[in-house]
């Protein structure tokens, strides 16, 4: 397989794989979409309170039965383990109801060649793993949108990402940079656990 066999027609907004042995993995957005569809189906059947957790994607339906908000955490990418548990360290905790919290990062899905770690989030400009961030998290009413946004934000500059997030109603983001800085969008703190 060769990246040159990926034919992108921006005008027609199409993608074509000219090599029949190639396939496209939609995992970067498919999981968020599936979580959102599951949440919407559950709500349509009358479910009023739930927290759906699917590998880095959290989707809150309503509030907890006691009326309090659900809690979610953004795992510390610099001290991450292979499996997120209650004892994992985090850089931000959020309260949420009828919201999704999705994180994309470079610390769980990667491989090492000659001592160099290569993660799975590819910068479309360089065709190499993106180097802007160690993780990006998004809060959004829609898990599918949040999943798309985390992947996209991971592959763009902080300035461009901040402009994008600030242009979207009801959407917030948190960026963890390779130098250990945690940067929040203007409304992230409104959701942060006190």
Give, region by region, the residue ranges found by the protein language model.
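Mature catalytic core of soluble alpha/beta enzymes
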Residues: 1-194
């Amino acid at each position: 397989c060769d990246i040159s066999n990926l034919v992108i027609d921006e005008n027609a907004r199409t993608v074509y794989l000219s090599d029949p042995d190639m396939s496209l993995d939609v995992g970067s957005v498919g999981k968020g979409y599936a979580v959102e569809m599951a949440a919407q189906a559950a709500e349509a059947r009358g479910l009023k309170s739930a927290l759906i957790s699917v590998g880095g994607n959290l989707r809150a339906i309503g509030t907890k039965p006691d009326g309090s908000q659900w809690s979610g955490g953004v795992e510390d990418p610099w001290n991450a383990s292979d499996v997120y548990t209650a004892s994992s360290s985090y850089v931000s905790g959020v309260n949420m109801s009828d919201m999704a919290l999705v994180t994309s990062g470079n610390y769980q899905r990667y491989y090492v060649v000659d001592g160099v770690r290569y993660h799975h989030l590819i910068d479309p400009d360089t065709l190499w793993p993106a180097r802007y961030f160690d993780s990006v998290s998004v809060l959004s009413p829609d898990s599918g949108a949040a999943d798309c946004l985390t992947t996209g934000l991971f592959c763009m500059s902080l300035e461009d990402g901040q402009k994008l997030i600030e242009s979207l109603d009801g959407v917030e983001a948190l960026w963890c940079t390779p130098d250990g800085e945690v940067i929040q969008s203007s409304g992230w703190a409104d959701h942060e656990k006190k």
